Regions:
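N-terminal signal-anchor/first transmembrane alpha helix
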Residues: 1-32
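Periplasmic/extracellular loop-to-transmembrane helix junction in inner-membrane transport proteins
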Residues: 2-4, 31-84
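Membrane-spanning helices that line or support transport/gating and their immediate boundary helices
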Residues: 30, 34, 95, 102-109, ...
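Generic hydrophobic transmembrane alpha-helix motif, especially the helices
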Residues: 112-148, 155-156
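Transmembrane alpha-helices
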Residues: 139, 143, 175-209, 236, ...
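Short cytoplasmic-facing helical segments at TM-TM junctions of multi-pass membrane proteins
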Residues: 152-197, 218, 222
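C-terminal transmembrane helix and the adjacent membrane-cytosol boundary/short C-terminal tail
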Residues: 235-272
Length: 272
């Protein structure tokens, strides 16, 4: 009961903070509510920062009229494909290189070089290879997700206790059994730690790709609004993307709790 009450109190204060931020935003852009401290024209604040009521009205108009569903579906499809493909390849390559020191040493400078490269500059190349459709956005998202997952899995496998490995080998564990019962459980916590960041990066890859070249998607809607200086629609697009990114992150957290039931929850180790 006490833990449930603490969670409710936390949610209350989180919502209260959100309400406070919205009120402050509204007060900042409504002419006459606050004295002008930067703009010579009191209407300029609304032009540059948007108005929360108009942003909410735009979001409502999108969903009530059905205009956004096709664009949102495209963006979510690109995001989920990039997230899934990047995660699968990141886990596979991370485990392989962690268990193959020779290959890891050989490929180490190349992996570091590609990781240091700003992946956004690859977007024009992907447009040439895959066109302006879903494929180029997925490819860009995969390059962002892959390295986050890869480095976490690589480190997680290498952090396996030598004592645990020695005990498993003494009990006659085969390489496949070691992978399933020792290496993978050790890497799982590292994998889920990376997935929370990967969700946002998958969205970044999809939206940036749409922004640079597309005819559909939420990034395309934001680009069109920017072209006519419609800041309210731009912010509305950001709000929609943020909301769905939080939903996907919540799904990852739910899966994590289901699969990592053996792991102590936050704060339990301190009580022990």
């Amino acid at each position: 009961m006490r833990g449930s009450g603490n969670r409710l109190a936390l949610r209350f204060w989180q919502l209260a903070l959100l309400a406070l931020l919205l009120v402050a935003w509204h007060a900042l852009v409504v002419p006459g509510v606050l004295p002008t401290f930067y703009f010579d024209d009191p209407n300029k604040a609304a032009f540059f920062f948007g108005e929360p009521l108009k942003v909410g009205a735009r979001v409502w108009q999108w969903f009530a009229g059905g205009e956004i569903y096709r664009h949102l579906w495209i963006t979510l499809l690109e995001t989920m494909l990039a997230f899934f493909i990047g995660t699968v390849f990141g886990v596979a390559v991370g485990i392989w290189l962690a268990l193959a020191p020779a290959a890891s040493a050989l490929l180490d400078p190349y992996i570091k070089a590609v990781n240091a490269m700003p992946r956004v500059i690859l977007a024009p190349i992907f447009f040439v290879w895959f066109g302006l459709g879903v494929g180029s956005k997925v490819a860009l998202g995969v390059t962002l997700v892959f390295f986050i997952v890869f480095f976490n899995v690589y480190q997680g496998v290498r952090e396996v206790s030598p004592v645990v490995l020695a005990n498993a080998r003494m009990l006659g564990a085969s390489p496949r059994q070691l992978l399933r019962h020792v290496y993978l459980p050790s890497a799982m916590s590292w994998v889920f730690a990376s997935l929370h960041n990967s969700v946002g990066l998958a969205f970044v890859g999809a939206v940036v790709g749409e922004y640079l070249g597309s005819s559909e998607g939420v990034g395309y809607l934001i680009l069109q609004a920017e072209g006519v200086f419609d800041i309210n629609t731009v912010v509305a697009g950001v709000v929609v993307l943020t909301a769905f990114a939080l939903i996907l992150d919540g799904i990852v957290s739910l899966v994590e709790r289901r699969l990592m039931v053996w792991q102590p929850r936050s704060g339990e180790t301190e009580r022990i």
